Amino acid sequence: KSRTRFQAVITNCRTGEAEYPDVKDFRTDTVYIRASSSLPFLSKMVKINGELYLDGGVSDSIPIKKSIENGNTKNIIIMTRDKKYRKKQSKLGKISAIRYKKYPKFVELMNTRFSRYNEILEYIYELERQGKVFIIQPETPLNLGRIEKNKEKLTNVYNIGYKEAEKRYSAMMEYL
C-alpha cells in the first residue's frame, strides 16, 4: 500500500468552490475521479453526498497552491500547453448561463476561467524562476483537441511528452 497521498480536484457546482477529496481506494473512490474528469457541456454532473460536481479544472486549473498548502516543497507540474499559450475568453458565456442557470456561481467560474488560468500561469512561471517548482511542458503547441480520439495524434503527443521528460530528466532529478 502506497503512502503517497492522492487528491482529486472537483468543482462544486452550487458553491463554485474547488474541493480536494482524498482518493484512498481506486475501487471505492472512483466517483471523485469521475467528477474530476467530467467536462462541462460534455459530461453529466456527478452527484456526491447530495452535491453536484464537475471537472476541477474549472475552479482550480493548476492546483499548485493547494499542493504547497499541503506541505509539498518539491512540485513537478506537467503541462499540456507550451509556455506562450494563454487562455482566451470563452465564447460559451451565454450558453453557460443557460445550461447551468441553476448554478450562478458555477457560471461565474466558467466566465472568469480564462483570467484565473492566465494568472496561475504567471504564478507558476514565477515559482519556476525562483526554483520552487519544476515544469515540464511542450516547446511548441501540440495541436490536439480536448477530447481527441485520433490514435495516431494521441500516440504522437505521447511520444512528444516522453521525449520532453527524457530531455528534462537530469534537471528534474537535480531539482528533487
Pin down the residues of each PLM region.
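Patatin-like phospholipase
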Residues: 1-176
